[in-house]
Protein backbone atom coordinates (compact mmCIF):
# COMPACT_ATOMS: atom_id res chain seq x y z
CA UNK A 1 0.00 0.00 0.00
CA UNK A 2 1.13 3.52 -0.63
CA UNK A 3 0.11 6.94 0.61
CA UNK A 4 -3.61 7.63 0.36
CA UNK A 5 -4.93 10.67 -1.48
CA UNK A 6 -5.46 12.73 1.68
CA UNK A 7 -1.85 12.22 2.77
CA UNK A 8 -0.64 13.08 -0.74
CA UNK A 9 -2.72 16.25 -0.82
CA UNK A 10 -1.35 17.29 2.57
CA UNK A 11 2.25 16.79 1.43
CA UNK A 12 1.62 18.61 -1.85
CA UNK A 13 0.03 21.58 -0.05
CA UNK A 14 3.00 21.82 2.28
CA UNK A 15 5.71 21.83 -0.40
CA UNK A 16 4.05 23.27 -3.53
CA UNK A 17 5.49 26.40 -5.11
CA UNK A 18 2.34 27.49 -6.96
CA UNK A 19 -1.39 26.85 -6.98
CA UNK A 20 -1.37 23.76 -9.18
CA UNK A 21 2.18 22.61 -8.57
CA UNK A 22 2.58 18.84 -8.33
CA UNK A 23 5.73 18.31 -10.35
CA UNK A 24 8.38 20.51 -8.77
CA UNK A 25 11.38 18.68 -7.32
CA UNK A 26 10.37 19.67 -3.78
CA UNK A 27 6.95 18.05 -4.13
CA UNK A 28 8.35 14.95 -5.82
CA UNK A 29 11.06 14.45 -3.18
CA UNK A 30 8.60 14.94 -0.33
CA UNK A 31 6.13 12.42 -1.81
CA UNK A 32 8.91 9.90 -2.37
CA UNK A 33 10.12 10.45 1.20
CA UNK A 34 6.62 9.69 2.48
CA UNK A 35 6.53 6.45 0.51
CA UNK A 36 10.01 5.53 1.77
CA UNK A 37 8.92 6.07 5.39
CA UNK A 38 5.86 3.90 4.81
CA UNK A 39 7.96 1.10 3.30
CA UNK A 40 10.53 1.17 6.10
CA UNK A 41 7.69 0.68 8.61
CA UNK A 42 6.36 -2.13 6.40
CA UNK A 43 9.73 -3.91 6.50
CA UNK A 44 9.80 -3.92 10.30
CA UNK A 45 6.92 -6.42 10.18
CA UNK A 46 7.64 -8.11 6.83
CA UNK A 47 11.35 -8.83 6.79
CA UNK A 48 11.23 -11.24 3.84
CA UNK A 49 9.34 -9.00 1.41
CA UNK A 50 12.15 -8.76 -1.10
CA UNK A 51 10.02 -7.56 -4.01
CA UNK A 52 8.99 -4.46 -2.10
CA UNK A 53 12.57 -4.00 -0.95
CA UNK A 54 13.61 -3.63 -4.59
CA UNK A 55 10.92 -0.99 -5.04
CA UNK A 56 12.28 0.81 -1.98
CA UNK A 57 15.75 0.84 -3.51
CA UNK A 58 14.34 2.33 -6.71
CA UNK A 59 12.57 5.06 -4.72
CA UNK A 60 15.74 5.89 -2.79
CA UNK A 61 17.69 6.16 -6.04
CA UNK A 62 15.02 8.34 -7.64
CA UNK A 63 15.01 10.65 -4.61
CA UNK A 64 18.81 10.81 -4.69
CA UNK A 65 18.77 11.86 -8.36
CA UNK A 66 16.14 14.54 -7.75
CA UNK A 67 18.09 15.91 -4.78
CA UNK A 68 21.29 16.02 -6.85
CA UNK A 69 19.42 17.95 -9.55
CA UNK A 70 18.00 20.40 -7.02
CA UNK A 71 21.37 20.92 -5.34
CA UNK A 72 23.02 21.56 -8.69
CA UNK A 73 20.39 24.08 -9.85
CA UNK A 74 19.19 25.87 -6.70
CA UNK A 75 21.24 25.44 -3.53
CA UNK A 76 18.89 27.49 -1.31
CA UNK A 77 15.80 25.43 -2.18
CA UNK A 78 17.83 22.27 -1.64
CA UNK A 79 18.95 23.35 1.84
CA UNK A 80 15.44 24.30 2.98
CA UNK A 81 14.01 21.04 1.63
CA UNK A 82 16.46 18.75 3.40
CA UNK A 83 16.01 20.70 6.63
CA UNK A 84 12.22 20.40 6.42
CA UNK A 85 12.36 16.68 5.61
CA UNK A 86 15.09 15.90 8.13
CA UNK A 87 17.50 14.45 5.56
CA UNK A 88 21.28 14.56 5.64
CA UNK A 89 23.27 16.64 3.16
CA UNK A 90 25.02 13.72 1.50
CA UNK A 91 24.08 14.38 -2.12
Curated annotation (Swiss-Prot):
One cellular component term from this protein's GO annotations in UniProt: cytosolic small ribosomal subunit
Q: Which PANTHER family match?
A: RIBOSOMAL PROTEIN S15, BACTERIAL AND ORGANELLAR, SMALL RIBOSOMAL SUBUNIT PROTEIN US15M
The UniProt keyword set, sorted, is: Ribonucleoprotein, Ribosomal protein, RNA-binding, rRNA-binding
Q: Assembly state and interactors?
A: Part of the 30S ribosomal subunit. Forms a bridge to the 50S subunit in the 70S ribosome, contacting the 23S rRNA.
Q: Which protein is depicted?
A: Small ribosomal subunit protein uS15
Q: InterPro entries annotated for this entry?
A: Ribosomal_uS15, Ribosomal_uS15_bac-type, uS15_NS1_RNA-bd_sf
Example of a GO MF term: rRNA binding
Organism superkingdom:
Bacteria
What family classification does the UniProt entry report for this protein?
A: Belongs to the universal ribosomal protein uS15 family.
Single Gene Ontology BP term? translation
Name the job this protein performs.
One of the primary rRNA binding proteins, it binds directly to 16S rRNA where it helps nucleate assembly of the platform of the 30S subunit by binding and bridging several RNA helices of the 16S rRNA. Forms an intersubunit bridge (bridge B4) with the 23S rRNA of the 50S subunit in the ribosome.
